[in-house]
């Protein structure tokens, strides 16, 4: 055993943690850029734009988690002296979309799948 065995082992573990953090940061940046580039007919009301998204990826599975907290929206419009009040209540939703592939390029497909959900509106 070499004299700096413990030091070398600690350095190896720190390098592994650093590499994992770098990969996670890269995935977050890729997700953020794909969300910004996403364009569909729903515009700003698309689940891709309105939900909080996070990505978990391993070598054999990718998982896109989405979450939206409950919210209330009230709009008052006055037309010809009469006011119309619209109150919308969203109960919130959360879930995940999983892909069991080994390709790193499936994130756009996961986002398109989330966009296609009609029950999330």
UniProtKB/Swiss-Prot annotation:
Q: Which UniProt keywords apply?
A: Early protein, Host-virus interaction, Inhibition of host caspases by virus, Modulation of host cell apoptosis by virus
Q: Name one GO biological process term.
A: symbiont-mediated suppression of host apoptosis
Give the Pfam families listed for this entry.
Adeno_E3_15_3
- Is Amino-acid biosynthesis there in the keyword field? no
Name the coiled-coil region(s).
Answer: none
Presence of the UniProt keyword Acetylation in the record: no
- Cystines in this chain: none
Give the family, as the similarity comment puts it. Belongs to the adenoviridae E3_15 family.
Q: What does this protein do?
A: Protects virus-infected cells from TNF-induced cytolysis.
Protein's UniProt name: Early E3 14.5 kDa protein
Organism this protein belongs to: Bovine adenovirus B serotype 3 (BAdV-3)
Gene for this protein?
A: E3
């Amino acid at each position: 055993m070499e004299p700096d065995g413990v030091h070398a082992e600690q350095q190896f573990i720190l390098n592994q943690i650093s590499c994992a953090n770098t990969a996670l940061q890269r995935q977050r940046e890729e997700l953020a850029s794909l969300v910004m580039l996403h364009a569909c007919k729903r515009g700003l009301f698309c689940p891709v734009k309105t939900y909080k998204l996070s990505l978990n990826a391993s070598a054999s599975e990718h998982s896109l988690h989405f979450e939206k907290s409950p919210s209330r929206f009230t709009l008052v419009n006055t037309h010809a002296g009469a006011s119309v009040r619209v109150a919308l209540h969203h109960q919130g939703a959360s879930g995940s979309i999983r892909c069991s592939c080994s390709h790193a390029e499936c994130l756009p497909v996961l986002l398109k799948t989330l966009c296609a959900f009609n029950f999330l509106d």
